Amino acid sequence: MYRLYDVGYTIALDRAATLLGDLGHGRVLPRRGDARAIEIRNPPLFAALGSRELHIGGAVYTALLSAHLFDFGVCSLRLQITALDGLTWPEFSAFGVAMSGMDVSAAQFDTELSALLKQIGPAIERQTVAPLTEDYVVYRIDRLISADASRTVSEQFPNETLAPLLFGDQRPLAASTLRELMPHRFSYYDDDLSVLTWENALVVEPREHDLDVEFVLEFANAQLLELRLYDLQLGAELPALYDRVDSLRARRPLRLSRAFREVLAGLQTHVADVTETVERVENALKVTNDVYLARVYAAALELFREQAWRHGIDRKLTILRETYSMLNGEALAARAELLELSIVVLIMAELVLSLSKFL
């Protein structure tokens, strides 16, 4: 279970590693062979935060808490809960549904985040926790007890079998609905499977230490959080800007040039910050070839509608740039009018002084 936060403008990961001390466990990169198709400019920092006790369905589970810190200002908290051995598929589905619906409150995650930020605060530029978070659940299976060797794992887990786990639906879903809800299924070997949905994913991977699929899904969620956050901020910025401009026009009609100066400076800085951050987020992970992990990552971005969020941000940035040009033109016009008025006043004063000599 993942919960991702935006905690600041940037995080100096080397500095954060020093501040974490023994809790820090270095940078994280995909390990499998096809990971060569993915380039990560500044790999996230991993921190092991210890174990926590959770109560699920009347049973007590020990969960491992960890964090990934991304240089573009995101902190991802991960709560890893191990199911009991020997569960049947219906039992595992019930466990997964109970886990995803358990009462791990926002306040509990916030408490864990606050403790972490106390340690790494000096490494964060412009530290502030944004009100927006991103949640995602990954169901992981390392071993199938009664696997059918004559069929691939993908064949053993058709969509209708996965629906109760991934969507919580106990009634059979129509075949057309299943195709629409689960279009993203991937297998690299016969014994692995990754199925992605908007809120969660199933990963069947017999190599216990191979967490590469989870890594790229987490990375995609971190990027989604940043895009959603800046889209939200820009959406709030536009009406606030219009209200401020209207107020300045009403209160200072003769001094618009000076009144708009602060607005223009702030607007220019904000547009530059958003543009730089969005580009840094999108360039944090680059796909160089069409292989397994790259396809999983691309599917996650498509599923999370990354392009739609980016288009929304670009549209709002265009409006802000056009507003900047309009206000700048209006300020220049106001300055020119004031200059013309000053010239007229000087001419009138000169005429008055000249006439006064003959009176």
Which residues does each predicted region cover?
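Short Lys/Arg-enriched alpha/beta "domain-start" segment
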Residues: 1-192, 197
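Short, surface-exposed linear patches
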Residues: 98-102, 217, 224-227, 343
